[in-house]
């Protein structure tokens, strides 16, 4: 995959070249998207809109730390949707990991989560965030046990994953309403890189065959159900709904 690669560390140790080789990235000086290695982290920038800033994965500080400490925990919609109850903490495959936020919420309340991400740039961002998270004194211990990254396309990997999870979680990119003020700066950068998941409808069936209990699909409230398969079961929040489908028991 071609992207502009920029090293701002000043270290001159070739770390960016190693990273590019690992994730199959090729430097393209004219690409509008840039993957930048800073002294602190790896980040994604949209070069024609510098005011949008850089996107990076941070499980330790910022919004994720606040959500971990002061968020709803088990009361969060995604936790309710996957079926967390009492001692039941399902094993989850997040087949559209993105920046790992929902996966992190589930891991922070006790679920073991395997994240799938097919875009190599996003996978590199996730891997960088995980490495910093694993090294953190406060959360590193449980994060290593509960949150892992698999760099693969969900369309093929969903048939190969073992052991089977109890829950498969899907949050495919859906085109945002153009005038929506809710399309945050971060989303604009992210969508410029990955675009909408045009093949997302193909995920539902393999997800239902893989999950032993249920499949949860996060959708904007204005979006049709995935693959146009309706379900009466959903957890509804302001702006979104989590559609729930039966899996395939062992």
Swiss-Prot record:
Record Gene3D superfamilies: Vaccinia Virus protein VP39, YhiQ-like domain
GO cellular-component term (any): cytoplasm
Enzyme type, top EC level: transferase
Source superkingdom: Bacteria
Keywords: Cytoplasm, Methyltransferase, rRNA processing, S-adenosyl-L-methionine, Transferase
Binding annotation for S-adenosyl-L-methionine: 101-102, 117-118, 153-154, 171
Keyword Transferase among UniProt keywords: yes
Reactions listed under catalytic activity: guanosine(1516) in 16S rRNA + S-adenosyl-L-methionine = N(2)-methylguanosine(1516) in 16S rRNA + S-adenosyl-L-homocysteine + H(+)
GO molecular function terms attached to this record: rRNA (guanine-N2-)-methyltransferase activity
Location(s), subcellular: Cytoplasm
Listed SUPFAM superfamilies: S-adenosyl-L-methionine-dependent methyltransferases
Protein purpose: Specifically methylates the guanosine in position 1516 of 16S rRNA.
Family: Belongs to the methyltransferase superfamily. RsmJ family.
Record HAMAP family: 16SrRNA_methyltr_J
Protein name, as recorded: Ribosomal RNA small subunit methyltransferase J
Organism: Shigella boydii serotype 18 (strain CDC 3083-94 / BS512)
Chain's gene name: rsmJ
């Amino acid at each position: 995959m071609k992207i502009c690669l920029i090293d701002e560390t000043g270290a001159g140790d070739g770390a960016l070249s190693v990273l590019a080789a690992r994730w199959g990235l090729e430097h393209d000086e004219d690409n509008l998207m840039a993957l930048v290695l800073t002294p602190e982290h790896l980040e994604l920038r949209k070069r024609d809109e510098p005011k949008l800033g850089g996107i990076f994965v941070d499980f330790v500080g910022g919004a994720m730390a606040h959500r971990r400490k002061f968020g709803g925990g088990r009361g969060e919609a995604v936790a309710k949707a996957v079926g967390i109850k009492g001692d039941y903490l399902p094993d989850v495959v997040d087949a559209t990991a993105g920046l790992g936020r929902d996966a992190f919420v589930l891991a922070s309340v006790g679920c073991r989560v395997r994240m799938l991400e097919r875009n190599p740039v996003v996978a590199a961002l996730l891997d960088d965030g995980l490495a910093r998270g694993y090294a953190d004194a406060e959360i590193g211990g449980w994060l290593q046990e509960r949150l892992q990254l698999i760099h693969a396309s969900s369309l093929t990997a969903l048939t190969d994953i073992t052991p089977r999870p109890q829950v498969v979680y899907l949050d495919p990119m859906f085109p945002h309403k153009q005038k929506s003020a809710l399309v945050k700066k971060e989303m604009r950068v992210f969508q410029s890189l990955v675009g909408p998941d045009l093949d997302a409808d193909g995920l539902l069936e393999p997800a239902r065959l893989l999950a032993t209990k249920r499949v949860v699909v996060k959708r904007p409230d204005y979006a049709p159900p995935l693959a146009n398969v309706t379900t009466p079961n959903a957890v509804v929040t302001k702006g979104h709904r989590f559609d729930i489908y039966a899996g395939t028991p062992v």
